[in-house]
A protein has these predicted regions:
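A short helix-loop-beta-strand connector motif used in the catalytic cores of GNAT acetyltransferases and
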Residues: 53-71, 170-173
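Conserved N-terminal entry element of GNAT/NAT acetyltransferase domains
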Residues: 1-22, 175-182
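C-terminal "cap" of GNAT-fold acetyltransferases
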Residues: 61, 126-141, 145-182
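Conserved acetyl-CoA-binding loop-helix of GNAT-fold acetyltransferases
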Residues: 98, 104-117, 141, 145
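Conserved acyl-CoA
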Residues: 110-127, 149
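Conserved beta-strand in the GNAT
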Residues: 71, 77-85, 92-97
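Active-site acidic-Proline motif in GNAT/NAT acetyltransferases
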Residues: 86, 99-101, 105, 134-135
Length: 182
């Protein structure tokens, strides 16, 4: 059975609202945790169990000043999302999720390109920053193919804070990735 293309049906990009919280939590969870995440390639199921986020965390991003939760719909269904936060000369990219059934079809590439465009045009930023769990070599390689570079700057994983999941290993940390937006 052929994989769906990101361009099979038109995509709609919009800012998330309070009404989107439950759908966004379900999307983010399905993309990274549990058995459903294994349908895609971005699963963290082997390194983290439990939740990836919760309704309060998503609502916090929606409501935060200088922050947007870009929501992507296709045929009326939320299929992807990402956080954009204005931080002075750069924007922060996070909470990125693509429906596992649509991963590998170009949708993620489309979403990140649109997020970069919006950050550049809306805030006039010259860089996009993100943090990725450093052991996620496949995911880091995907970002590198999109122009992001590893900085070697690490921050600790929030061990003991189950809002971010239950670690299955003791060597987790976040690495800062940066891309010049031109």
């Amino acid at each position: 059975m052929p994989m769906e293309s990101a361009t099979d049906t038109a995509l709609t990009f919009r800012d998330a609202t309070d009404a989107d919280v439950d759908a966004l939590v379900a999307l983010i969870q399905s993309a990274y945790r549990g058995e459903s995440s294994r349908a895609g390639w971005t699963t963290e199921a082997d390194i983290l169990q439990g939740q990836r986020t919760d309704p309060e965390g998503v609502l916090e991003v929606i409501k935060a000043p200088d922050s947007r939760l870009l929501t992507v719909e296709r045929a009326g269904r939320v299929v992807a999302c990402c956080q954009l936060e204005h931080r002075g000369a750069h924007a922060y990219f996070g909470m990125f999720a693509v429906s596992p059934a649509l991963q590998g079809a170009g949708l993620g590439r489309t979403v990140i390109a649109e997020a970069e465009r919006q950050a550049r045009e809306t805030w006039g930023v010259s860089e996009m920053h993100m943090t990725v769990i450093s052991v996620r070599e496949d995911l880091i390689a995907w970002y590198e193919r999109r122009g992001y570079r590893r900085t070697g700057r690490m921050t600790p994983f929030p061990y003991g804070d189950e809002r971010f999941g239950i670690p299955q290993r003791d060597d987790l940390e976040f690495e800062l990735l940066v891309k010049e937006l031109v």
